[in-house]
C-alpha cells in the first residue's frame, strides 16, 4: 500500500511538471499551415508502427487538399492520446477503432477518433476534459485536459459524443472524440498523403 501511494504521488508530480511543460510550449508555439490528410496519415502510421500487433484499426481520409492551422507536433500529441485511450476500450475487430477526417458542407474540417467501446457514464462524461479527473486509479486524468489546452491554443475545439459508425458487423454505436479546426483552406496543388512528415 505504501509503495502504491508513493508511485501514485510520483506520477502526479511528473504529470504536474508535464502540464507546466505543455503550457510553456503552448505559449511559445505558432500555428503552422498543415495538410490535414497528410499529417493525420503520418501520425496514424507512426502510432501503429509502435505496436503493429495490438494497434489495429481503419483510417478514412476525407479532407483531400485541405490545410488547417495547427502545430503538427501538437496535433500528433492530441491524436496519440486519443488513439491510446480508444485502444484500451475497443473491441477485437479490425474496424473497432476508426480514425477519420472530413469536411462539412460549410467547409469546416475535422478529425475524429471513434471506437466501439461501452458508453461512458454521464458522471464521467461531464468531467472528461477536467484536469486530474479519471475513472481509473492508475490514470492521472491529464491526457484529455492537455488535448483541450492544445486545441484551444490553435483555435480548435475538441468534444465527445456517443455516435454510430458503419462497420463490417453493421451499424455500431461507439465513442467519438472530434477535433474541429478553426481555419480551413484548399491547397493549390493536390497533396500526397505523406506531404507532411511528423517526427
Feature locations, PLM:
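Short conserved segment of the HATPase_c
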Residues: 120-132
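A conserved beta-strand-to-alpha-helix junction within the catalytic ATP-binding
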Residues: 30-45
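Conserved micro-motifs of the catalytic ATP-binding
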Residues: 24-29, 67-70, 135
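Short alpha-helical Gxxx[C/S/T] motif in the catalytic ATP-binding
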Residues: 143, 147
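Short alpha-helical segment of the dimerization/phosphotransfer core of two-component systems
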Residues: 4-9
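Short helix-loop "hinge" at the ATP-lid/N-box region of the Bergerat-fold HATPase_c
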Residues: 86-87
Amino acid at each position: 500500500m505504501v509503495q502504491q501511494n508513493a508511485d501514485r504521488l510520483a506520477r502526479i508530480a511528473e504529470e504536474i511538471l508535464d502540464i507546466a511543460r505543455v503550457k510553456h510550449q503552448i505559449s511559445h508555439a505558432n500555428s503552422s499551415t498543415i495538410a490535414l490528410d497528410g499529417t493525420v496519415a503520418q501520425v496514424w502510421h507512426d502510432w501503429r508502427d509502435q505496436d503493429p500487433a495490438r494497434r489495429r484499426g481503419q483510417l478514412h481520409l476525407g479532407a483531400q487538399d485541405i490545410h488547417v492551422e495547427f502545430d503538427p507536433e501538437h496535433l500528433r500529441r492530441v491524436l496519440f492520446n486519443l488513439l491510446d485511450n480508444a485502444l484500451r476500450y475497443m473491441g477485437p475487430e479490425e474496424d473497432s477503432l476508426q480514425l477519420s477526417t472530413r469536411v462539412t458542407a460549410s467547409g469546416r474540417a475535422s478529425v475524429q477518433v471513434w471506437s466501439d467501446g461501452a458508453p461512458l457514464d454521464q458522471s464521467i462524461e461531464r468531467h472528461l476534459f477536467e484536469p486530474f479527473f479519471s475513472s481509473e486509479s492508475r490514470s492521472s486524468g491529464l491526457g484529455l485536459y492537455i488535448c483541450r489546452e492544445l486545441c484551444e491554443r490553435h483555435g480548435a475545439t475538441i468534444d465527445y459524443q456517443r455516435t454510430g459508425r458503419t462497420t463490417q458487423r453493421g451499424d455500431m454505436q461507439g465513442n467519438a472524440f472530434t477535433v474541429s479546426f478553426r481555419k480551413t483552406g484548399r491547397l493549390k496543388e493536390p497533396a500526397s498523403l505523406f506531404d507532411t512528415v511528423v517526427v
